[in-house]
UniProtKB/Swiss-Prot annotation:
Residue segments, region Disordered: 328-366
Region (Mediates microtubule-binding and homooligomerization): 168-211
Organism: Mus musculus
Annotated binding of Zn(2+), by residue: C126, H129, C149, H155
Annotated Acidic residues bias: 334-347
Coiled coil: 194-258
Protein name: Tripartite motif-containing protein 54
Ranges where the COS domain occurs: 271-329
Expression sites (tissue/organ): Selectively expressed in heart and skeletal muscle (at protein level). Also detected in lung and brain at much lower level.
Location(s), subcellular: Cytoplasm, Cytoskeleton; Cytoplasm, Myofibril, Sarcomere, Z line
Zinc fingers, RING-type class: 26-82
Lineage, broadest ranks: Eukaryota, Metazoa, Chordata, Craniata, Vertebrata
């Protein structure tokens, strides 16, 4: 069945247009939504400008988007349902745009701007019976047709129904389908919002765990530095004690050497004395001094190996091996000190498990 194609406006008659316009009114400015349109967590829509005005009124100390001051966000209530809307530091610019509503507004404005004669319903005429309007619907062939086609033409054996009846039925089906699609879009939008919140929570939790990880490794480094300082002090004390003893012996031996050298010099000068009487006057005393000097017992020398410092060697291989085994413990609750390390301005770890470092026992680095 062939017929001339006409059309009705996409959005229906003036009554439907008025109903649609009512759905596109912003509850704040009472005008049609102006783009961009943002969707709140409660699924109500606002002009972003209007949402920002309400947000600024509820948060007078919050800095505007162009300010260099960092803000921690704020909150306001939806004017439609009074649901509290919590915003991050981006303010209303962090809200999701409702592209579906924006597209509907564009279509509405396009339809509203059509000339009146273009909006008038055009009748479809049957091509086989040029003077007959399309006024019935063939249920068997699922096409519109005219009465003559049913009486004399190709559809005389088909089951037909009045065109308005099928029109209302299919329009109702399409309307239900649109409602389901819009509801589905709302659910998808809600899921997107939830997943964006999950992304934000993942970033917050990761940032917190990174800070805890850095703090714990800094603690390990501090323990190592403290222990290294203690061992270096012990080594320095031993070094000083040994050096003092050896240097004391060096001074004692030096004093003895100096006295012995002077005595040798005096004895040699005495032996060069040509007069026997004068020599004999000094010889007895010198002989006694030389004998006494040769019998002087000096303090003992350092025992063999006294200079060795091998007892201060440190084996760190086993500790290093333990450190290499440090790993995460998925699902383990954080230590008690974790509660004292809460980061300013960070919230929400619900549903996500913390991971903490597993430091092997016996490493001395807990």
């Amino acid at each position: 069945m062939n017929f001339t194609v006409g059309f009705k406006p996409l959005l229906g008659d003036a009554h439907n247009m008025d109903n649609l316009e009512k759905q596109l009114i912003c509850p704040i400015c009472l005008e049609m939504f102006s783009k961009p349109v943002v969707i709140l967590p409660c699924q109500h829509n606002l002009c972003r400008k209007c949402a920002n005005d309400v947000f600024q009124a509820s948060n007078p100390l919050w800095q505007s988007r162009g300010s260099t001051t960092v803000s921690s966000g704020g909150r306001f209530r939806c004017p439609s349902c009074r649901h509290e809307v919590v915003l991050d530091r981006h303010g209303v610019y962090g809200l999701q745009r409702n592209l579906l509503v924006e597209n509907i507004i564009d279509i509405y404005k396009q339809e509203s701007s059509r000339p009146l004669h273009a909006k008038a319903e055009q009748h479809l005429m049957c091509e086989e019976h040029e003077d007959e309007k399309i006024n019935i619907y063939c249920l068997s062939c699922e096409v519109p047709t005219c009465s003559l086609c049913k009486v004399f033409g190709a559809h005389k054996d088909c089951e037909v129904a009045p065109l308005p009846t099928i029109y209302k039925r299919q329009k109702s089906e399409l309307s239900d389908g649109i409602a389901m699609l819009v509801a589905g879009n709302d659910r998808v939008q809600a899921v997107i919002t939830q997943m964006e919140e999950v992304c934000q929570t993942i970033e917050d939790n990761s940032r917190r765990q990174k800070q805890l990880l850095n703090q714990r490794f800094e603690t390990l480094c501090a323990v190592l530095e403290e222990r290294k300082g203690e061992l270096l002090q012990a080594l320095a004390r031993e070094q000083e004690e040994k050096l003092q003893r050896v240097r004391g012996l060096i001074r004692q031996y030096g004093d003895h050497l100096e006295g012995s050298s002077k005595l040798v010099e005096s004895a040699i000068q005495s032996m060069e004395e040509p007069q026997m009487a004068l020599y004999l006057q000094q010889a007895k005393e010198l002989i006694n001094k030389v004998g006494a000097m040769s019998k002087v017992e000096l303090a003992g020398r350092p025992e063999p190996g006294y200079e060795s410092m091998e007892q201060f060697s440190v084996s760190v291989e086993h500790v290093a091996e333990m450190l290499r085994t440090i790993d995460f413990q998925p699902g383990a609750a954080g230590d008690e000190e974790d509660d004292d390390m809460a980061l300013d301005g960070e919230e929400g770890n619900a549903g996500l498990e913390e991971e903490r470092l597993d430091v092997p026992e016996g490493s001395g680095l807990h």
